[in-house]
Amino acid sequence: MLKILIPVDGSSHALQAVHHALRLVGAGLKARFVVANVQEAANLYELVVAHDPTVLQQVSEAAGRDLVRPAVALLSAAGLQVEQVVASGDPTNMLAEILESHGCDAVIMSTHGSGLRAAVLGSVSQEMVQQSAVPVTLVKVPKDEQPA
């Protein structure tokens, strides 16, 4: 049985990848899933102002859990095995670590359309395609949902 990583960022675009995975399962794919969110690491200002790095870590983890919840709920409702992971750091590097540590065989993730915003946000998906040791399926966001 394949183990597939689905990175999510809380956007409706990320849920497109979950819906694609559900379509594949509906067509007969046997898989279990790891839904992951990578939070940005705290910057120096946040560390100084917070006075307690543990609090920042707890807030970051809670935010990540909130962001993976819809994807986990969709997959669980379909009766699929789902793990959830929240990490902090550089998204591409952390996703590569999650791939390896969880023994994932593939990645399904969304792209963010086109334009300047996509050039920044879509860079994680492009980096994953270039750097991943496993197949990466990119789910394109429909034109009517792409950012301007």
Residue ranges and their predicted role:
Residues L2-H51:
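Small/aliphatic-rich secondary-structure junction motif
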Residues A73-V107, E145-A148:
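Structural beta-alpha unit
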Residues V34-A36, E83-A87, T137-V139:
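General small-molecule cofactor/ligand-binding pocket signal
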